[in-house]
């Protein structure tokens, strides 16, 4: 990208864990009723990925709670925009794009998609985005870091899915 004349700088996601938790609350605010009713009407079974994210056992939120969640969403969007403005002041240019992974792994094994955080935060922000393939996994280059210690239970599940070769890696822009 730099060879093409673009300025590239590191971007640290702002309050990422907070955003992931917030979007999950929004996704599951009806306790999974909408998605499971739609699946029932279609005759399609719920895939494990959906049941993890939209579990019918999740508590439904009432209208006032939902409004409060959306106020938190709006506040987070405003804070994120402020982070953009601060970075633009720092670099002296407008930010044209954030280029980030869409998934933590190169490909997803059937029924093993566990972490929605990368794409979901972009959705929470209401950003326009596109996913593009950028390279391929290569077992000679993309080696497992044996001494890696997972940051959480979810991170351990994701790390267990990271051994691929020949599959595409994608970025969300």
Language-model features: locations:
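Short hydrophobic alpha-helical runs that function as membrane-insertion/retention elements
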Residues: 129-132
């Amino acid at each position: 990208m730099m060879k093409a004349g673009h300025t590239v700088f590191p971007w640290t996601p702002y309050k990422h864990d907070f955003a992931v938790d917030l979007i999950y609350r929004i996704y599951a605010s009806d306790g999974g009723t909408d998605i499971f009713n739609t699946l029932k009407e279609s005759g399609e079974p719920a895939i494990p990925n959906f049941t993890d994210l939209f579990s019918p056992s999740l508590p439904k939120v009432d209208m006032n709670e939902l409004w409060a969640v959306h106020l938190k969403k709006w506040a987070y969007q405003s804070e994120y925009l402020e982070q953009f403005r601060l970075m633009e002041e720092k670099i002296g240019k407008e930010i044209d794009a954030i280029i980030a992974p869409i998934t933590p792994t190169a490909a997803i094994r059937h029924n093993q998609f566990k972490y929605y955080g990368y794409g979901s935060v972009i959705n929470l922000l209401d950003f326009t985005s596109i996913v593009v393939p950028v390279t391929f996994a290569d077992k000679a280059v993309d080696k497992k870091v044996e001494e890696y210690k997972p940051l959480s239970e979810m991170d351990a599940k994701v790390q267990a899915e990271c051994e691929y070769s020949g599959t595409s890696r994608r970025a969300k822009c």
